[in-house]
Amino acid sequence: MYSHPHNAGVAAAPQKPETFMLSTEAQQALPHDAQVALQQVDNLKYFLISAPVDWQPDQYIRRFLLPTGEYVSCVLWNNLFHISGTDIVRCLSFRFQAFGRPVKNSKKFEEGIFSDLRNLKSGTDASLEEPKSPFLDFLYKNNCIRTQKKQKVFYWYSVPHDRLFLDALERDLKREKMGQEATTMAVSEPALSFQYDSSQSLYEQLTKAQQANSSSFNAQQVSFPPSQSTSPVMRAMDSMPPPPQMMPQPMPQSMAPLADGLDAMVPYAAMGMAPGMPPQPAVKREPDFNRVQYNQNGVPINQGHQRHASMPAYGLEYSPAPSFVSSHYDDYGNRGISFEPLTPPQQAMGMGAEPAYIANEETGLYTAIPDHMNGVNGLNGMIQLPPSNLAGPQFTRSYGSNNVYSVIEGSPTYKQRRRRSSIPPGMSAIAAATAAATAAHRPSDLRRSVSASVGPVAEGDESLDNSPPGLIYSNQPMSMANHQREAMEQMSRHGTPLSTVEGSPGMHNVNLEQQQYPMPSEDMTSPMDDRSRPMAQGGPSVVRRARSATVMGSEVGPYPQKSHSCPIPTCGRLFKRLEHLKRHVRTHTQERPYICPYCSKAFSRSDNLAQHKRTHDRADGGEGLILSGEDEEEYSGDDHLGSLEEASPTSEGGYVTSSLNSAMAHSNTSQHPGSNAVSPNPGPMSHAPTYNSMQTLMQPMQMSQPQPINAGGMM
C-alpha cells in the first residue's frame, strides 16, 4: 500500500496523514497544485501548534486565515485556550479539499465530525457552556460558532486533528466500498492515489508508517556527538540529511507594523522595518563558540545547538523547527485580535544558520532576523535564540519534504486509543524496549526502564533523565551536575523564575541576575511552609504547574513511555505522562485557571490553590491542614500513580500573598517554632538553611511581565 525507501542516500518519506501511503518519489511527483495544497495544510498545522505562544496581556483571540477564506480562531477564556467545534470542522473541510476530496455533503460531514468530538469529555478536554453564556456570546460575535445553544468548546491542545481527519476519511472510504454515498469525493491527487486497506484502521496504518519511517530514518544517521569543527563533512554527519535541492526564495528583509482592523492589510513590498532595529550584520557561516550566550530558557546557545543536533528522529519528527520571536516587531500586541501568517518559515538555502522569523499575514511569508544580532535589546529583553538549523549551516530544513507537523495528537482519552498507567511494573522494561524500537534510541531509555520497573518517578527526575541529550551539560561530570541540580533546587524554592526553572532542565550554571524573565507573584515561594516532601524527590521542576487542557504529544505506541514532546520549538522537553506535559506547557502559556474564591488570585496548579486556601483558613483561626474531599481530589491531579509522582517539594509550600506585610508576617512566623503556623511535621525542614525573606522577595522583583489576561473580566 505504501513504500518506504531504506537506502541511505534517500531521506525517508514524511509520514503525514495525507501522504503516508506514498513513497518519496511519488510525493515528489505530485502535481504542483497538490504540493502547494499540502504545504498549506502544514501552514495550518503550524498555527495549531504555535497559536497559544507569545500572547500579549491585552490579547484574547488569535486568528488564522484559511485559503478557503474562513478564519480559525484560538480564544483565551478563563486563562485557557479554546477552539470551537465549528472551527474544527472548518479545519477538516479545508484539509479534505487540500487532500483532493472536497466535501460535497457538508451537513452529513459535519455530523460525523461532531460525533467524533463526543469522545472529548467536558471538564477534561472541553468546557461545557450553557446557552448564550458570556463565552458563547463572545465566540458568536467573533464568528467562531453559528449558534449559541448549549455546546462544548474544546481545549486547544485536546483536539486530535490528524485522528479526526483519518476517522472522517475512513468513514467515507467505507461508504464508497459498500456502495453508499460518501460525504466527500476524490477529484485530484493525492486522494486519487489513495488505496484503502480495510483490514486495519487508517490511524493504525499511519502509526505503523510513522514507526517504520522512524526506524529507516535512524538507520541513516550516525550517532556522533555534535561537531564544532569547521569541516562540512563532519557537520553533515551529525545533522539532518540535506533537503532536496531547491532554488532559494529571496526573503524580504523588512516589514512594518500592521494597522488595526480586519481588512487593514499592507502590501508586503511596502513594509519597512520597525524603528529601533540595529543594522543587520552579515550572517556567519559558523556559530561563535568562544562566547556563551543564553536563550530565553536559560540554555546556552551552543547547548541549544547541540540539542538540535543530537535530537533523534523522534524529536525532529514531532517538534517544529523554527524559533518563535516576540511580537515586539509588529503591532499585533496592541489590539485584542491577532492574525497569524499563512505559512511557516520556508527554506533559504543561501543563509547560514536558520534565522528566527517575523510573520506577515498578507503574503504568508516570513521576514528573516539574523541569529547573530548585535543588539539584544532589539528582542525586547529576550536573549538570542539558538540557531535552529540542527547544527548544519549548510543544510536548512525543508518544510515541504521533511518530517514536520506529522501527527497532531490531542487528548489520550479520544476513543481510548492510549491506556492509562495500568501496565504491571514488570512490563515496564518491555514497554521501554518497544518504545526504543519505534522511536529513536535515547541513552536514558535503559535508566527509565529500570526506574519504571521499581516505581513511578517524580517529574523532576524525568526532566533530566529523558530530556534531549543536548539539554544537559554533557561536558560536566555527573557528580557536579547533581550538585548543581541540588543548588538549583534550593534557589528555585526561593525566587527563581519558573520559566527558567522548568523551561530548561539543563540550566545549572546560569547567572540568574541576568535573567529578564518573570515569575508571577503567586508562584513565589517563601520559607514559610516548606515542610511537605523529602528533598530526594526534587529537581529543576520543584515548582510545577497545575493540570491543564490536554496537550499534544507524539504518537509512538500505546505505552506511556516518554512519547510526549513540548510543542515549543526552543524547549522540546520529553515527558512520559501527558499530565506532566500539560503542566509544563503552562510555563510557556502562563495559564492560571484555578481561582481563589476568597481573594480571586489565580494559580496554575490546583495544589497551589489548595495550599493558598489554607492561608485563608489559618487567618480564620483554623489549622487549614486537612483537605476537604473536593480539595483533595483537585490536589491529587489527573493521574493515579500515587503521591510519589505527583509530589513536589513545594507543592504544599506557602505562597507569598499580594501583601508584602503579610508575606513578612508569614516569614517571621516560620522562623519561630512556637508559632501555630508552623507545620506539625517540621522534620524535613530542620536541616534546611534559613533564608532572608526580604532577599527572597527582592530577587523576583527584578523581573517584570504583565500578568496574564482574563478575557472574561474584559467583557
UniProtKB/Swiss-Prot annotation:
**This protein's superkingdom?**
Eukaryota
Query: Which keywords are on file for this protein?
Result: Metal-binding, Nucleus, Repeat, Transcription, Transcription regulation, Virulence, Zinc, Zinc-finger
Kindly list the GO CC terms recorded for this protein: nucleus; Ste12p-Dig1p-Dig2p complex; Tec1p-Ste12p-Dig1p complex
Q: Where is the composition biased (Low complexity)?
A: 214-224
Localization in the cell: Nucleus
Q: Region labeled Disordered — which residues?
A: 214-243, 439-469, 518-539, 632-691
Gene3D superfamilies this protein is in? Classic Zinc Finger (3.30.160.60)
Molecular function via GO: DNA-binding transcription factor activity; zinc ion binding
PROSITE patterns in the record, alphabetically? ZINC_FINGER_C2H2_1, ZINC_FINGER_C2H2_2
Q: Name one GO biological process term.
A: sexual reproduction
Which coarse location class describes where this protein primarily resides?
nucleus
- Ranges of compositional bias, category Polar residues: 648-679
Deletion consequences: Impairs pathogenicity on rice and barley leaves but does not affect appressorium formation. However, fails to penetrate onion epidermal cells and to cause spreading lesions. Reduces significantly the expression of the cell surface sensor MSB2.
Q: Which family does it belong to?
A: Belongs to the STE12 transcription factor family.
General function of this protein: Transcription factor that may function downstream of PMK1 to regulate genes involved in infectious hyphae growth. Is not essential for vegetative growth, conidiation or appressorium formation. May be involved in the regulation of the expression of the cell surface sensor MSB2.
Q: What is this protein called?
A: Transcription factor MST12
Provenance organism:
Pyricularia oryzae (strain 70-15 / ATCC MYA-4617 / FGSC 8958)
Ranked from the top, the taxonomy reads: Eukaryota, Fungi, Dikarya, Ascomycota, Pezizomycotina
